Amino acid sequence: MPKGPKQQPPEPEWIGDGEGTSPADKVVKKGKKDKKTKKTFFEELAVEDKQAGEEEKLQKEKEQQQQQQQQKKKRDTRKGRRKKDVDDDSDERVLMERLKQLSVPASDEEDEVPAPIPRGRKKAKGGNVFEALIQDDSEEEEEEEENRVLKPAKPEKNRINKAVAEEPPGLRSKKGKEEKSKGKAKSKPAAADSEGEEEEEDTAKEKEPPQQGKDRDKKEAEQGSGEEKEEKEGDLKANDPYANLSKKEKKKLKKQMDYERQVESLKAANAAENDFSVSQAEVSSRQAMLENASDIKLEKFSISAHGKELFVNADLYIVAGRRYGLVGPNGKGKTTLLKHIANRALSIPPNIDVLLCEQEVVADETPAVQAVLRADTKRLRLLEEERRLQGQLEQGDDTAAEKLEKVYEELRATGAAAAEAKARRILAGLGFDPEMQNRPTQKFSGGWRMRVSLARALFMEPTLLMLDEPTNHLDLNAVIWLNNYLQGWRKTLLIVSHDQGFLDDVCTDIIHLDTQRLHYYRGNYMTFKKMYQQKQKELLKQYEKQEKKLKELKAGGKSTKQAEKQTKEVLTRKQQKCRRKNQDEESQEPPELLKRPKEYTVRFTFPDPPPLSPPVLGLHGVTFGYEGQKPLFKNLDFGIDMDSRICIVGPNGVGKSTLLLLLTGKLTPTNGEMRKNHRLKIGFFNQQYAEQLHMEETPTEYLQRSFNLPYQDARKCLGRFGLESHAHTIQICKLSGGQKARVVFAELACREPDVLILDEPTNNLDIESIDALGEAINDYKGAVIVVSHDARLITETNCQLWVVEEQGVSQIDGDFDDYKREVLEALGEVMVNRPRD
């Protein structure tokens, strides 16, 4: 056996320990001195404080900085990365000044290296001041604390903690923030101490007596295997950034990551809409198991925009294969919900592909039909692969034949051969004739490019297709085709529309947005309307019963507050009973007293005109065409009476709006004339109604100036057409499209017209307002001429259908269903007669 180092007398080792003795020697030798003299820990600190001088402090700071740099290089090499060097001198000075303020001697204890303890014993956090101040500041420091063993120095730690606790709160919080922001930099001296432990222990081993050296060798052999295991565990934890996090910390981190992902998704999708905030309950274990399900189940999500809460703890349930209509008053968040689903700001199952049709296609040289076909990227990829393999086959590569056969099989499975026919069928249904289908998209207006975008969405057939007011840019013929086409849609559909007839024919379910929640009704819109009215009646009965109970309690001597409290207690007991019955473990909101159900009612009224002798208006021998174009009309000849109810129909571009302008006198015929009663007053609602408004005025000022009305009368007129009171005094330029439309209707009523000529009046109106408009037309005693794509408005007002075709106008024999059948037959479609739920 090799001889151990010569035993050294213990006394000289304590002389000049700051110069010739390593920190490890001091730890071991001071332990012996403690046993002999039995001095307390604080006495030892006092002695050491006197022995340490300013030169020793500077020397140790330099040594500490060198050890820190060595440790940083080793860590960078081990983890395979290099980080930027951080200068910790200022941080150490701050801590040294803090230690001086706390009256804690930091000259020796600061540089002590804890002696290792045998494996299996509990590791005690030692007297390293840096650790005592910044423990648990970072995940990296926690890993280092697990891989090193500290010498017990509990009295010092307690003393420091006590001193910190006695520090003024303001100073402590301020310094705490500084330390927390620099936690990683401050943890490096302690890590450097543990890194240099091996060299210091070798030095101490050489100075030990032979017997102690043997014992130490034995202990190190026992500890070696334990340290290797700990080192492996440390490497595993270093690779796993979440290994040292508690369950609570992991849960918090997951929420933060989900929130950041949602925010980034919204910013990427629409940078202009950065005022939205979204929150959603965590995905339950059952939902996690159903990530590959075809249904959507979102529970307790909230959405706010510009500080206004749109959804609060709402639930979204969408079953695959159902066709949903999302309804509710304007401005309550319907479009916002569709955008959040499309941007995946909410937790949509990853296997569900979602498409929201909201933007028109790019205007370029691409023909309309090719713009639709290029939406199918899978088909394009297979066709490109087919061309490449055919080229290889022609060059004599026999291996390409087998691959080419597989490509053919995939093309047949996706129906690639019928893709162009399908695209042309959709475009034809939306109003594109063969010449228009091959026309570049840059030659179309915005409305027609929006139709191309809708055609692309229908052609792609996503798992969940969302349409926001799809009929707004369509004429009646296109609406009839789309209505019929979507009745055969086999995938999931979510529609926002104000066309009640469209919702009745297409939808199998209705989602009602009310009081920041989503309520579900099975059936079409008509079924929902009946069920909702019944629900409102029941709520009104419950409210009246509650008010009666409150009156009885007040009559019995209870105060209003006491009566309400007692009523709430009764509701709470009922809620708890219902919860136990349904075994609902989730916490529910505390019950509140019922409020009187609010009925959203809108009533349009037009004053009845005086009687006029017929005909009041007509076109006689009229021919008209725009300059440089072929004539739209030839030899028009018809008259209108006071009891006429006429709806002008036909595809886009045949001249429906032009015919209305001829009747109002805004266009002069090329030949012939427009005749009208000299007392006739015409009220005209134009699609571009915003052009006739003065945007800088308020609605009240506009009516007062136009008709010399008193202030209160102007506001009453606006209120009758459903314009909210707060919007009466806002500049017209700041109103929404629906609010501007109501101002125009109020202006029409103030004009007291004898004939109403309405060009697409339902655009930007909600369903309740369209119903009110239909009732107003039925009550009106004057003539009505309307161009509309809303089938229900046409049928509810019993309008005669005049179709514009072949440069003329003719009346249709039959009702609206006959016209629908005629339109579909002309397109080669079969009319779907789906039984309504």
UniProtKB/Swiss-Prot annotation:
Matching InterPro entries: AAA+_ATPase (IPR003593), ABC_transporter-like_ATP-bd (IPR003439), ABC_transporter-like_CS (IPR017871), ABCF_EF3_subfamily (IPR050611), P-loop_NTPase (IPR027417)
GO cellular component, one term: cytoplasm
Biased composition (Basic residues): 29-39, 71-83
Modifications made to the protein after synthesis: Phosphorylated at phosphoserine and phosphothreonine. Phosphorylation on Ser-107 and Ser-138 by CK2; inhibits association of EIF2 with ribosomes.
UniProt cross-references to PROSITE patterns, sorted A to Z: ABC_TRANSPORTER_1, ABC_TRANSPORTER_2
GO molecular function: ATP binding; ATP hydrolysis activity; ribosome binding; translation activator activity
Gene3D superfamilies: P-loop containing nucleotide triphosphate hydrolases (3.40.50.300)
List of residues binding ATP 2: 650-657
Keyword ATP-binding: yes
Protein location: Cytoplasm; Nucleus, Nucleoplasm; Nucleus envelope
Main localization (coarse): cytoplasm
One family name in Pfam for this protein: ABC_tran
Biased composition (Acidic residues): 134-146, 194-203
Sites of Phosphoserine modification: 22, 90, 103, 107, 138, 194, 225, 587
Similarity section: Belongs to the ABC transporter superfamily. ABCF family. EF3 subfamily.
Role summary: Required for efficient Cap- and IRES-mediated mRNA translation initiation. Not involved in the ribosome biogenesis.
The protein, known as: ATP-binding cassette sub-family F member 1
Species the sequence originates in: Mus musculus (Mouse)
Phylogenetic lineage: Eukaryota, Metazoa, Chordata, Craniata, Vertebrata
